[in-house]
Every structure is written in C-alpha cells, then in structure tokens.
C-alpha cells in the first residue's frame, strides 16, 4: 500500500491523476524489487540457499488454510435483515467469493498484502470478485491520520510493433477511483509517462478510456496480513537459510564419501612403479605399505568431524525454532502424533490461533468495506431483495482445525438441559455444521414434523379407546383369520 500527499479532489483533474499514477507506479515497482519479489522467491523455493526443504511455503500455506480456507459467514443482529443476509451468503458462494478471498489470503500470507477487485459486467444483478496479483497491483492512500484510499491500479505488460525490426514493451494500466475506471498506458516499461490507452478521435472513445462504476468506493480493496504488512514466513528467513545450508552440506557430505582423501602416517610409498602398485591395491580395498623406522603405520580417511546424528540434532533444533517463531506448528511432529483432549489441543495450537486472530482483526475492516460496496451497487440497481444494514453485520470465522466435537456436544447438551443454550451459537461451535442457519431451519422443520406425527398418534389412540369393544365371536373370527394367514405362509415357505 502506498501513501501519497494528495486528496480526493486532486484526482478529479486528469493531469494530476496521471502524475500521481506515475509516482505510484514507480514506488510500486521499487516495493516489488526490494521486498515482494523476494517474498515470492522464498515461497517458490528460490531463496538465499538452495531450498532442500521449502519451509516458507509450508508456513504460508498452512497459516492461510487455517485462517480462511472455510469462507467467513455473515450474519446480522436485525431480524428484518436476516433473510437478505442469508440470500447474500448464498449469492457470494455462487460468485466464488470464498475462492477469491482464499487467494487474497494466500498472497497476504506470502508478502503481507492481498488485493480483491469488486467489479460487474453489463446487466449483472450482483457484483463479481477476483483476487489480483500483488506484484502488479496496489492501492494508494492519502496522508490523513486515518488514511483513505485515493485510487487503486493493476497493470499488465504488453508488446506492440514499432516497425518490422523493433518491438516496444509497455504497461497497460487499469486505474480505479471511487467513481471511474481509467484505461491508461505507459510509453514503455522504462519510460513510465502515462496517457490514455485509446486514442480519442470520437466521442465514444472517451467512455472507452474512462468508464463510470457504481460501488461508491475504490473497487480494489487492500487486505493486510498484519500491521507490519509482512508475510507469515518473513520473520524466519534467516533460520530457513541456515536450515537449508546445513541440509545442503549434509547431502554434499554424503556425496563426497567416494571422494574422501586417504591420510597415511609414517608410510613409505616408494618410487613411481611402487606408487602405481599401491593405487591398484587400494582399488582392491587392500593397503600394503612399508613402515618408516618402526614409528607405527596409520591410515584413515579425512572426513567431516560432525556425524549424521550431530547434523540431524542441529537441523531439528533449527526446525523447532522456525515453527516456534513463525507460530505455525509442525503437524508431522511427535507432539501431534497422539489423540488429545480439546483443551490440550488448544494449548498446542495457542500461537497458531493467536496468529489467526491477528489476521481476523486486519481482515474485518476490509470485508466490511467490500460489503458496503455490494450494498451501494445493489441500491443503485434497485435490487432491494439483497440490501441490508452493513453496520449490524457480524463476521464469523471458522478456523480449519481438528476439533473434539464429542466434548463440544456434551457441553451443548448440558447448557440445553439448564435452559442456557442459544441454539444457533451452539451450532456454530460444531466443525461439521457448515451452514448453521440452514441446519437450524431444517432442524426446526424436523421437530415440527415429529410433533405432528406424535399428535396424530395420540389422536388415533384416543379414538381407539372410544370404539366399542369387540364381542367374543368377533375376536374368534379375528384369531382364526390370523391363524389362517400364518398357516398359509408356512405352506408357501415349504
């Protein structure tokens, strides 16, 4: 994210906006060179040391999967908005919002920032969402105490023919303010002077370069991973390098066994002919040499003084430090090899859960911003069926962790028995209940159906009691009929 000394009024002038875009583009490319490219290199296994074990990818992927692999649920305190929010949750699922948000979270876990574009196509009744590449995207803010977004941009690199012998590479830039989307370009990738992408020859060319939108805010929303805007593995880059350096040396040590140097002490080899014979004996794994003045012959290979056990102990120590500092545990370790109670599991995952809670606090405001843009768009197209009061929204995250549902069900039953259970809140705590609103409504319908069946059975039993008792001959006829059925079935079976 980039801060510029400008205001929302400045960007209404195209010339000022273009100059700000040029400054922002230069700053962005500098951020990519100095930081973000390195973050993605570590994630892809291209760090300072050859990555025998890609710890950065494990940390970034695992933390993001814990945090946002299950999309957050939106609910409301207002009963009159409940139906609209339920419809929005379903619509967001159909629009692939969960996948887009997961990709945003993945980028934020890697480099500290992720970007989500809210957009629409012609005649859309509901917005669409896509995650943008941080290496080609950024959002610019003013310098207020509470910075507000001025504009966002994303760009692609393109090539054009200058003549039959020469090509020109340039950036095509999409710039979004709170009112318009601009289509711009640079002269080249080295000359970042900005101007309109389409030549303005006709009146309609202006609309191709400057298209209005109706989200009421800059449609690119920045999602911070933490207050420092760093990735989850950033704090352990040095340890990752040390870990992989030792791993690389250990592998080289094994490969070099065949090239070990033989050290001979107090041995007379002799002339060239005797030396050739000595080498031949070595090839046959035999050593024969003359002792010098009875001083004692000694022969040994020069090897690394560190044994494989010593190296593995050092690797385990560094690995433990990596997972402790990054707060992302190693789930393949012995600590997670046995079944544990819910409390014991939470203690092991305390740092992991704290990391997820920090991400929640950073994502909350960005998600509320996206919901406001959705609401603005729905109000503009007068789709009242989906509109809602954003200030009353509650965001519920479900962390993708192993859980002891048996203990949780016991607690829920105990609360229900003493009359202190909120059914919906109880359902939220169960990992296997994905859509607690739908589950709750279906459960209510099932209870009503069961009650109806029980009531009908009671009525049937009451009616039977009111019927006149059967006479003896009627009972005899019924008994004979039953016996006849039984004997008939026996004959058929024979």
Residue ranges with predicted function:
Residues 277-293, 310, 317-494:
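C-terminal helix-loop subdomains that flank or include functional centers
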Residues 84, 93-101, 108, 235, ...:
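Short amphipathic alpha-helical segments
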Residues 81-88, 297-300, 349:
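A short, surface-exposed helix-loop junction/capping segment
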Residues 89, 105, 240, 244-247, ...:
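Short, well-ordered alpha-helical packing segments
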Residues 28-32, 39, 95-100, 108-115, ...:
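Short secondary-structure junctions and interdomain/linker hinges
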Residues 1-136, 140, 485-494:
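Extended, helix-rich architectural segments
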